[in-house]
Amino acid sequence: MARKTPINRYRNIGIVAHVDAGKTTTTERVLFYTGLSHKIGEVHDGAATMDWMEQEQERGITITSAATTCFWAGMDKQYDQHRINIIDTPGHVDFTIEVERSLRVLDGAVVVFCGSSGVEPQSETVWRQADKYHVPRVVFVNKMDRAGADFERVVGQIRKRLGATCVPIHLNIGSEENFRGVIDLIKMKAINWNESDQGMTFTYEGIPAELQDRAEALRTELVEAAAEASDELMDKYLEGEELTEEEIKLALRQRTINNEIVLATCGSAFKNKGVQAVLDAVIEFLPAPADVPAITGVLDDKDETEATRPADDEAPFAALAFKIATDPFVGTLTFFRCYSGVVNTGDSVYNPVKAKRERFGRIVQMHAKDREELKEVRAGDIAAAIGLKDVTTGDTLCDPNHIITLERMDFPEPVISIAVEPRSQADQEKMALALGKLAAEDPSFKVNTDEESGQTIISGMGELHLDIIVDRMRREFSVECNVGKPQVAYRETIRGKVDVEGKFVRQSGGRGQFGHVWLTIEPNEEGAGYEFINNIVGGAIPKEFIPSVDKGIHEQMQNGVLAGYPVLDVKVTLFDGSYHDVDSSEMAFKIAGSMGFRKGAAEAKPVLLEPTMKVEVTTPEDWMGDVVGDLNRRRGVIEGMEDGVAGIKIVLAKVPLSEMFGYSTDLRSATQGRASYSMEFFNYSEAPNNVAKAIIDARQS
């Protein structure tokens, strides 16, 4: 079967934003204008197409990234038909993991900002994530009809707070209730969308006289930004020649794809103005799969050679599973991005991370929650497979004859835990099944059993994250459960360096056990995790026993040394030891490694680490003193203060998570409900002695 749309007319994009910037409404309009939904769904009514889980429709926030495919040929039908694969991502801080894994498989993004509140804390997080994966962006300043909307102020904030070179290609005509349309600064014409057909048609008009000067000034900035794309254009511009519309567009496209500039558009999705022009910008300025560097991975050979997979149907098949979702009708859906090659239904593929073969039973393309069956998937496509048995988020799927492992995604450690218990015996098994499925879907959600109390502990990225997990267990799996008080996920590490002996000997007639190791235990760099170095020379310990020592140390690290919390950032070097021809076994060396680590870590100045959160409080000036005083009482460190709009102040602080429980209620009562806050995980830092002592005593009592 030949390719329907050439790969240069593909756009894989995400729509990302802060929680209330109007992202889902923007996506709804995209579906409406591209002819995929005949009735516009409103978030206000709980009827939006992309928000397909019940919790999303109730809370009015998007939780899972629904993937959808649509076609667009331009507002004026000026292009060939382009295929746009869109992933709608959540904006709430507790779901940053969803955003992160979507950005990993996208080629470009539309970042939506609210015209009145501008750059908010979550926008910065999303922006940093997009920087991390080098995703080219176009900005859409939405809600231009809202009170206090100011397009140029938001552009200024993007430059200042996000450090981006932001170049407007639109200028708004009127704002707040007088918002009428936009000026296209490349064509230097006003666009007037027709209200009678919900903006499906439009007319070009002259620029209003009062905006002529401002539009010309902004156009000069835009042409200068385009001219910087190449020496030839710069020479032409400096010699006073006009750049053609075609030259400007190609230059802006090149600089956007290179992440040198970010183009800004504006409008109001709710009022059906502007989204149509954003779709044009996606086609004109965001990359096709072949315009971005080919994805890299490592081959399945001795040296783990680096290799690339270009966006080409002829290349061997390689794809990345970026999301697992449970569908009530078909079971598990594995969303994947095909980077190279072609795969057909019924084909066998290989998962190098799990070292297993999988078979593609059925392949579907999703439109929010409607499915279209596909026979094949080609380079550049985003689709979902049904019937894959053992695939988790971030796994590679590839051609069994050309094995490659694409780089995996990093997932943040959960910072908050709660105990859950089923209400009845009948719910016990159902709960285990439900938690297993939810953990497979979401890598930032972990489930484990507390060995002492036997309780099931679930951990996640924040209180809302865990609320929604408990809610989903009730609705999707009919499991009723009781929930305990939230607990903080503490960690431990060491500050000193020691050499230590670990010896496990059992010799009492018959076959005994003998394992003997010498280890150097020292701190590793922050964030570097656990590192095991084998420095055994001359066969002091046979090769086959060394992985067991590593395993024993690793298992002991999970149990901690101070208060039973997992140990982070440690480097262990195995440098000597001895063995017994008959009595040595893998088990004996595993126990010796574990004993050595427990003894050594206890001597290497162990300390307790607590999660610190980056907190941003937005408050009217009158309550500023109260807010700062309260954060100080919570062991917070005030990092800075900024001015918001209309007498609003923004306080930036780092505060230990343990001090932030119940903060929203306290903040509301202290400021008569007028202040709001957001927080996200920042890092693990050493807990003060008095705090550490209280936690250790509580764990040991």
UniProtKB/Swiss-Prot annotation:
<keyword id="KW-0251">Elongation factor</keyword>
<feature type="binding site">
    <location>
        <begin position="17"/>
        <end position="24"/>
    </location>
    <ligand>
        <name>GTP</name>
    </ligand>
</feature>
<dbReference type="InterPro" id="IPR035647">
    <property type="entry name" value="EFG_III/V"/>
</dbReference>
<dbReference type="InterPro" id="IPR035649">
    <property type="entry name" value="EFG_V"/>
</dbReference>
<dbReference type="InterPro" id="IPR020568">
    <property type="entry name" value="Ribosomal_Su5_D2-typ_SF"/>
</dbReference>
<feature type="domain" description="tr-type G">
    <location>
        <begin position="8"/>
        <end position="290"/>
    </location>
</feature>
<dbReference type="Pfam" id="PF00009">
    <property type="entry name" value="GTP_EFTU"/>
</dbReference>
<dbReference type="InterPro" id="IPR000640">
    <property type="entry name" value="EFG_V-like"/>
</dbReference>
<keyword id="KW-0648">Protein biosynthesis</keyword>
<dbReference type="InterPro" id="IPR047872">
    <property type="entry name" value="EFG_IV"/>
</dbReference>
<dbReference type="GO" id="GO:0005737">
    <property type="term" value="C:cytoplasm"/>
</dbReference>
<dbReference type="InterPro" id="IPR000795">
    <property type="entry name" value="T_Tr_GTP-bd_dom"/>
</dbReference>
<dbReference type="InterPro" id="IPR004161">
    <property type="entry name" value="EFTu-like_2"/>
</dbReference>
<dbReference type="InterPro" id="IPR005225">
    <property type="entry name" value="Small_GTP-bd"/>
</dbReference>
<dbReference type="Pfam" id="PF03764">
    <property type="entry name" value="EFG_IV"/>
</dbReference>
<comment type="function">
    <text>Catalyzes the GTP-dependent ribosomal translocation step during translation elongation. During this step, the ribosome changes from the pre-translocational (PRE) to the post-translocational (POST) state as the newly formed A-site-bound peptidyl-tRNA and P-site-bound deacylated tRNA move to the P and E sites, respectively. Catalyzes the coordinated movement of the two tRNA molecules, the mRNA and conformational changes in the ribosome.</text>
</comment>
<dbReference type="Pfam" id="PF00679">
    <property type="entry name" value="EFG_C"/>
</dbReference>
<dbReference type="InterPro" id="IPR005517">
    <property type="entry name" value="Transl_elong_EFG/EF2_IV"/>
</dbReference>
<dbReference type="Pfam" id="PF14492">
    <property type="entry name" value="EFG_III"/>
</dbReference>
<keyword id="KW-0547">Nucleotide-binding</keyword>
<feature type="binding site">
    <location>
        <begin position="88"/>
        <end position="92"/>
    </location>
    <ligand>
        <name>GTP</name>
    </ligand>
</feature>
<dbReference type="InterPro" id="IPR031157">
    <property type="entry name" value="G_TR_CS"/>
</dbReference>
<dbReference type="InterPro" id="IPR009022">
    <property type="entry name" value="EFG_III"/>
</dbReference>
<dbReference type="Pfam" id="PF03144">
    <property type="entry name" value="GTP_EFTU_D2"/>
</dbReference>
<dbReference type="InterPro" id="IPR041095">
    <property type="entry name" value="EFG_II"/>
</dbReference>
<dbReference type="GO" id="GO:0097216">
    <property type="term" value="F:guanosine tetraphosphate binding"/>
</dbReference>
<dbReference type="GO" id="GO:0005525">
    <property type="term" value="F:GTP binding"/>
</dbReference>
<feature type="binding site">
    <location>
        <begin position="142"/>
        <end position="145"/>
    </location>
    <ligand>
        <name>GTP</name>
    </ligand>
</feature>
<dbReference type="InterPro" id="IPR009000">
    <property type="entry name" value="Transl_B-barrel_sf"/>
</dbReference>
<dbReference type="InterPro" id="IPR027417">
    <property type="entry name" value="P-loop_NTPase"/>
</dbReference>
<dbReference type="GO" id="GO:0003924">
    <property type="term" value="F:GTPase activity"/>
</dbReference>
<keyword id="KW-0342">GTP-binding</keyword>
<dbReference type="InterPro" id="IPR014721">
    <property type="entry name" value="Ribsml_uS5_D2-typ_fold_subgr"/>
</dbReference>
<keyword id="KW-0963">Cytoplasm</keyword>
<protein>
    <recommendedName>
        <fullName>Elongation factor G 2</fullName>
    </recommendedName>
</protein>
<dbReference type="InterPro" id="IPR004540">
    <property type="entry name" value="Transl_elong_EFG/EF2"/>
</dbReference>
<dbReference type="GO" id="GO:0003746">
    <property type="term" value="F:translation elongation factor activity"/>
</dbReference>
<comment type="similarity">
    <text>Belongs to the TRAFAC class translation factor GTPase superfamily. Classic translation factor GTPase family. EF-G/EF-2 subfamily.</text>
</comment>
<dbReference type="GO" id="GO:0032790">
    <property type="term" value="P:ribosome disassembly"/>
</dbReference>
